[in-house]
Amino acid sequence: MTSSSPNATKVKVAILLVNRQFIRSWIDSGLIKHLEANSNFEIHLFSDSEIHKRLPTSNDYKTVDLGEIQISKRTKHTVAMGLAQMSSRSRTFRFKLIRLFLPETLLFARHGNLRFKTVWFYKSFRRIIGNSLHNRMTLCYFFPPLRALINLYLKVLNEKPTLPKEISNGNFEWLIIPSASAIGYTTDFLEGANSIGLKTMIAIDNWDHLTGKSIYPIKPDYFTVMGKRCVEHAVQIHECDATRVLPFGLPRFDIYRKIEHNCNESFRVNKPRVLYCGFSLAHAEKQVVSSLANYFESRYGVGSIEVHYRPHPGPLPRYDGSTITNSNIEITSYKDLKRTAMPDMDEEFLNAILQADVVVGAPTTLILESLAIRKKCVLDLTNDGYHRTSAGNSALWHTHMIDLTDIKELPRGNTIDELHDQVDQMLQQPANCLHLDIENLYNTSEMLYRDQLLHFLLSAQHSKID
């Protein structure tokens, strides 16, 4: 590890954390400690009050409470208008706009008796009216004359976002902003940083951000993204300079680059195990999990194959009313998630994936994580007849999910029967692993994210890059 001399001036780096998940990605992962340990850097963590109270006490960095961060009106309108203007560049943007008005539920349920379908229609129609009233301003963004009036209003308003004085007066060389969703503070902070010549980096913390979470009216000096495919999305959707988009991976995914894969190694504890990974969007997955368990019990006998269900830690509401009544299904119960909103990526988390013979789920992050460590996976692409966002339909509308379904060798089930057959076939295969080419999405053979970031910052320090 390169170290500076005792008398060398340290590079001051400001890191802005305004999402609980970044505590896991940047602090719990050891990333910030790794940067600070280099001795070339002095790390300062800035956050709003809500996040600041959750930050652990450490000598590895200094923390600053910025209070409540206000977002400018210009940014609120500009980002929202951008989604409408750029909807032709990403299916996810279009689906996101559709879902602002149409509910998560289908207007007509495809299952149930007449009374159930009638009540379903009534509630879905009410949601359409409620959504339309709540998001009525978005309609203005679709019409150029109205956009022109809004832009004129914003010009007259003449807002000039500035950085908090704790950052602008801190003599920092870098402002790094981890980002996972469309939050307007990013644009305000980028504009404020540009006004004082502060170099900026947006560290994207997921794989769907550039395809559907936000737009960038003002771009940072650099992005870090999960993989090469994300670089392509940055160029094609956001018109970024490819040389400014760095495919370092994700801080929380470094754990998968540390695992040495062995095709002959089995992590099976007892019986063959199927793990179903829950979906964040509304999907009647409990019906799918129950059907898998019932299928294996009827085919091989009760208790012959374990079925484990790991719900998403932050799922959107489901409206189908399904419950799991089969007591043989093992359901993950999460500990207190108030601190980071996500489960710790500890040994228990890893073992949940490693000890499964087959991992099943919608095209979500956890499926990608399972593929990264060569687990046998099957995609759930079923449609439940209740939700607009059920797995099969979501896979057609989300650009990042299409990147996963484009891997033709990845087994999938478009119907419940197909899903049963595909999972059964994968269980019967003697191989413990599945080797698919996902390097364009996430490359496990690259250096750890924290090492790539460290090397980049050191190179920037020595070469004084812009």
Question: Which stretches of residues belong to each language-model region?
Answer:
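Short acidic-hydrophobic, aromatic-tinged amphipathic segments that line or gate anion-handling sites
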Residues: V64-G67, T332-K335, T340-A341, D406-E418
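C-terminal alpha-helical cap of glycosyltransferases
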Residues: N443-D466
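Conserved catalytic-core segment of nucleotide-activated headgroup transferases in glycan assembly
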Residues: I27-D28, F253-R339, G413-T415
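Donor nucleotide-activated moiety binding/catalytic core segment of transferases
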Residues: I167-S168, G314-L368, I373
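Short active-site oxyanion
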Residues: E42-I43, I218-F223, E306, Q355-V358, ...
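Extreme N-terminal starter segment of soluble prokaryotic enzymes
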Residues: T9-V13
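Catalytic binding pocket for nucleotide-activated donors in carbohydrate/polymer assembly enzymes
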Residues: P217-P220, T365-L441
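Active-site and donor-binding regions of nucleotide-sugar-utilizing enzymes
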Residues: A14-R257, G314-L316, L366-I367
